[in-house]
Amino acid sequence: MAKVPDLFEDLKNCYSENEEYSSEIDHLSLNQKSFYDMSCDPLHEDCMSLSTSEISKTSQLTFKENVVVVAANGKILKKRRLSLSQFITDDDLEGIANDTEEVIMKPRSVAYNFHNNEKYNYIRIIKSQFILNDNLNQSIVRQTGGNYLMTAALQNLDDAVKFDMGAYTSEDSKLPVTLRISKTRLFVSAQNEDEPVLLKEMPETPKTIRDETNLLFFWERHGSKHYFKSVAQPKLFIATQERKLVHMARGQPSITDFRLLETQP
């Protein structure tokens, strides 16, 4: 039986005597250029296709180091760090929209004026024709003859407003979205604290948003509770309160958490 090549032994042989072999991710990243500049033979295909379990059987290194090397060779880890230059991908959106357990870690640091020059590019609709209920089990409906929203206890949910959620790119780990009334061009637009949100008509779905950040909300989810935080005013959330229109608020006495009810399979 042919001996399985030892991937980690080959990797260590590619380092010069003056370079220290390290198992830490940051150290591996710093030495990556020198790694590729070394004049060593490329690894055999059979060696590159080994699974993590097969590799761990032929190496004395720890499991943590196995994961590091596999990641360096292009394998996608379940937990990964998004850098400031890396956008949220379609796979990330699927994970978020379908409530999987994937963890997207936040960048280590963000510049103070980071959001000032940020632009948000449209990706796609990630949820269609859903209803928002507050924790009093009241549904969001349109105010008769106006460009405002209110809440009502409904017997027939067909009378509730149906929303579409459009996802946009972000240069951090948050997910900015727009809330559009389904089958219309009316978008929810954040206002100042305690002011009612407006329904703003747009000629089309904005492909890039720079200044119109009132249309964007960071969608946050904690269990079955959903929150929509204004991108333009990050301390304010879409909120409801009895005998008031849907408005922007920091928290109590307003209700800022919602249940999202799907109306389509």
Swiss-Prot record:
Molecular functions per Gene Ontology: copper ion binding; cytokine activity; interleukin-1 receptor binding
Is 4Fe-4S one of the keywords?
A: no
Q: For this entry, list what GO says about its biological process.
A: cellular response to heat; cellular response to lipopolysaccharide; cytokine-mediated signaling pathway; fever generation; immune response; inflammatory response; positive regulation of canonical NF-kappaB signal transduction; positive regulation of cell division
Q: What is its main location?
A: nucleus
PTM notes: Acetylated within its nuclear localization sequence, which impacts subcellular localization. Proteolytic processed by CAPN1 in a calcium-dependent manner. Cleavage from 31 kDa precursor to 18 kDa biologically active molecules.
For the region Nuclear localization signal (NLS), give the residue spans. 78-82
- What InterPro entries does its record include? IL-1_alpha (IPR003295), IL-1_CS (IPR020877), IL-1_fam (IPR000975), IL-1_propep (IPR003502), IL1/FGF (IPR008996)
GO terms for CC? cytosol; extracellular space; nucleus
List every position bearing Phosphoserine. S83
Q: What is the superkingdom listed in this entry's lineage?
A: Eukaryota
Q: Which residues are glycosylated?
A: N98, N137
> What are the protein's UniProt keywords?
Acetylation, Cytokine, Cytoplasm, Glycoprotein, Inflammatory response, Mitogen, Nucleus, Phosphoprotein, Pyrogen, Secreted
Please report the propeptide residues according to the UniProt annotation: 1-108
Give one Pfam family, short name only: IL1
Q: Where in the cell is it found?
A: Nucleus; Cytoplasm; Secreted
Q: Which family does it belong to?
A: Belongs to the IL-1 family.
What does the comment on domains in this protein's record state? The similarity among the IL-1 precursors suggests that the amino ends of these proteins serve some as yet undefined function.
Q: How does it assemble?
A: Monomer. Interacts with TMED10; the interaction mediates the translocation from the cytoplasm into the ERGIC (endoplasmic reticulum-Golgi intermediate compartment) and thereby secretion. Interacts with IL1R1. Interacts with S100A13; this interaction is the first step in the export of IL1A, followed by direct translocation of this complex across the plasma membrane.
The record's function comment reads: Cytokine constitutively present intracellularly in nearly all resting non-hematopoietic cells that plays an important role in inflammation and bridges the innate and adaptive immune systems. After binding to its receptor IL1R1 together with its accessory protein IL1RAP, forms the high affinity interleukin-1 receptor complex. Signaling involves the recruitment of adapter molecules such as MYD88, IRAK1 or IRAK4. In turn, mediates the activation of NF-kappa-B and the three MAPK pathways p38, p42/p44 and JNK pathways.
What is this protein's name?
Interleukin-1 alpha
Record the organism: Canis lupus familiaris
